[in-house]
Every structure is written in C-alpha cells, then in structure tokens.
Amino acid sequence: MKMKAKWLPIAAAVTAALASQAAFAVDFHGYFRSGVGVSSDGDMQTLSKQKVGRLGNEDDTYGEVQLGQEVFNKDGKTFYVDSMFAMIPNGSNDWEGTGSVCNFDEKQCSGDSEFALRQFNVQAKGLLGFAPEATLWAGKRYYQRHDIHISDFYYWNISGAGAGIEGVQAGPGKISFAWVRNDRGWDGKDGWTKFEGMDVNTLDLRYAGIPLWQDASLEVGVDYAIANPTDAQKDSSNVQYKNAKDGVMLTAELTQGIFGGFNKTVLQYGTEGYSKTMAFYGDGSWYGAEAKDGADGFRIINHGVIPMGNSWEMGHQLVYGVGNDMWDGNDKWETMSVVARPMYKWDDFNKTIFEGGYFKDKNKSTNGSSLEDSGYKLTLSQTWSAGSSFWARPEIRVFTSYAALDDNDMAGTPYNSKTSKDTWNFGVQAEAWW
C-alpha cells in the first residue's frame, strides 16, 4: 500500500499532462528521400544534380525531422521553439549508425550514417512595439532559403546559427535583417591548414514582397561576409588568412505567376569570396575567403513550374554563372546548365515524368589555355503520388537514367571504376514532405 501511495501523485501529474491540450500541440514536419538502385558498374553512379537535375540521379537516403511548439501566447505575444535534426545513411545495410565500420582495414574506417543538428531556435512575435508583426529570432535556423527543387540547387541560403528581425512591414514590402555565422571550414584544398577553420559572419538584409504588375513581385537583398581570422591565424605562415577579404553578394529575384504556376528570374553579383558562390553553384552559406584579392562574379538564373493544360506540367532551370580571377592563374570560370522536367498525368495518382539536363563548365587560364567539362543526363520515370500536382507528395518512382560526359578535361573518367565517361542507372525512389 505504501508503494501504491508513493506513485499516486506521479500518476496524477502524468495524467494531467496528457489531458492537457498543450501536450498535443507539437508541430511535426519533415522530409525524406530513399530508395534502391543499380548502375552499369555496381551501385548507382551520379552526375552533379545541381547541373543536370535530381530525378533518377540521387543515390542517398536523406531525412529531416522537425519538431516545434508554441510555448507561450499571451496578450499578443508569442514564443515558438523550433528544432530539426537530419540523417544521411548510405543505404547499404539495415543497421546504419554513426559508429565506425572498418571493413577489416583500420585505414578505411568510416561511419554508415551522418547525424546533423540543422535547427534549434526561438521565434518570438509581438515584442517589438514599432513592428508587432515582426519576428524576433535567435538560434540555429533555416533562414529564408531560395532553391530550385528539380535540381536541389539552393542559390540564396545563409542558414546557420544567428539572430535577426524578420518581416518588418515597410511600405508595400517587408524588411528582414539577420546576422548568421558561416565559417570557412577546412576541406583539404586552397592552402588551408587542417582543422583551422576561419570565423566568417554574414550580415543579411532583404526587402521582399514588392508588388510590380499583375501577379509579379520583387525581392532584393544584400549579404556582407566579414572574414574574422584570429590573431594567431593572421600571424601564421598561411597567406590565405592574411589575404582573406570581406565580400558582398547582391541578389534580385523577380517572381511572375503564370497559369497557376510561377517563373523566377534571379540576378546575383558577388565580390571576393562570393565569386566562388557564383561559379560553383554556391548558396551564400559557404564563403570562399581564400579567393584572390579583387575576384568577382555574377550569375543569372531562370526557373519555375508551369502548367500546360490539364494533363501537363513542366519544371525548368537555366543557369549561367561566371567567376573572375578567383586564384592565381585563373582568368575566368564559366558554367552553364539547363534542366527540363515535363510531366504527364494519367490520372490523379499516376504520372509519367521525363527529365533531361545538360551542363558545360569552362576554366580559362591567364596564359590563354582552357579546360572544359560538359555532359548530360536523361531520366524516364513512372510515378505514383498522393495527388496530381507537380508538388504532390508522397511519391514513389520507378526510373531509368543515362548519364554521360562529352568533354572531360577536368572530370576525367568518373564511371565504371574510373574507366568510362558514361553510365546508366535503374532504381526505385520514394520522396515525401509533410
């Protein structure tokens, strides 16, 4: 009886918590893609999806789980706590964790899976007297990301740990300001010493929702990357730290509604480390602080999803980017890519999708010589989805793909155990978001 009496208060507290409406108010969101596939030489072999499209060109399992809850709401003031973690297993086995797998050779030890903390932040509204509609936030966050879905290409995305004020009404549009940390980490290249990442802070200012003509709006923004090496890094023999310069990235995005779909045209210009963002399909969250003093670049992007009658929809991407004088000996790096994904709807749940993509990269040196890579990917997929829309998910796809390089001065022969310029893939993939 004493034991029973001891547990009664605890049981009552648990019951009260479960009965509370707030206990069930957790927002649950997420994303995943996963599947299985083979190629002409073992498991799937891919070609840069940002350049030629992602359909039938992804060999990973990737998942995000997001949990959030409004923890306070009183007198027009709210506080919301948001969180997200992500996992990337390689998909080769049942049990895939972060522990080491050595394959009988200590020099080949690696984990089956990577775990990442993507978001943990607080978002508050109603606290700013001059802008009660605005959101005051701090923590690690996905911040106003701009991307092209068919290629998984994020072209404006400074997400990370930071703070800011978002959505201040100013005339016809809204202003947002953020301070986010985007360190330049070591990748074994460009003269950086191992484990010596450099502190980089990004200041981001945006004005969004500017109305133009019918169904058209404009968003403009500026990002300023502040290179912040330590005194020890400045005094080191590594000239990359001494030469690191602050950089500016300017972005303008025009959105036009078309037949229930949309088309976006994006113009971007970057100086110093942002020159590499323009040339190498960067998003602004990675700053190439080691770029040569005076480097710059620009990028033009057009993308969208447009309905074509009752049975057809098409997604598309056009990208042209240039980086100038990014390192000693570099004159100009040019990149171009085009992707199209037409889709035919047989009924509300059954689709046939084709995706074709082509890219070309050219690296011109100051001595007049140049190196070129170019290639393409073709995919045909039979798809079943929860609805007929281009964006309907979950979706299950059976696909076959062919990928090939035309020019391969820099890429070499990446397929079939480094002996071939082309490959084919066959597989099944699921994708969902909620």
Curated annotation (Swiss-Prot):
An annotated Gene Ontology molecular function: maltose transporting porin activity
Q: Name one Pfam family in it.
A: LamB
Tell me which residues are marked as the site Important in sugar transport: Y154
Q: Which UniProt keywords apply?
A: Cell outer membrane, Ion transport, Membrane, Porin, Signal, Sugar transport, Transmembrane, Transmembrane beta strand, Transport
Kindly list the GO CC terms recorded for this protein.
cell outer membrane; pore complex
Membrane topology annotation: Multi-pass membrane protein
Summarize induction of expression: By maltose.
Sites annotated Greasy slide, important in sugar transport: Y31, Y62, W95, F262, W391, W433
List residues traversing the bilayer: none
Report the locations given in the UniProt record.
Cell outer membrane
Q: Which positions make up the signal peptide? A: 1-25
Give the reaction(s) catalysed.
beta-maltose(in) = beta-maltose(out)
Name the Gene Ontology biological process terms: monoatomic ion transport
On assembly, the entry states: Homotrimer formed of three 18-stranded antiparallel beta-barrels, containing three independent channels.
- What does the record give as the function of this protein? Involved in the transport of maltose and maltodextrins.
Family of this protein: Belongs to the porin LamB (TC 1.B.3) family.
What this protein is called in its record is Maltoporin
What's the source species for this entry?
Answer: Aeromonas hydrophila
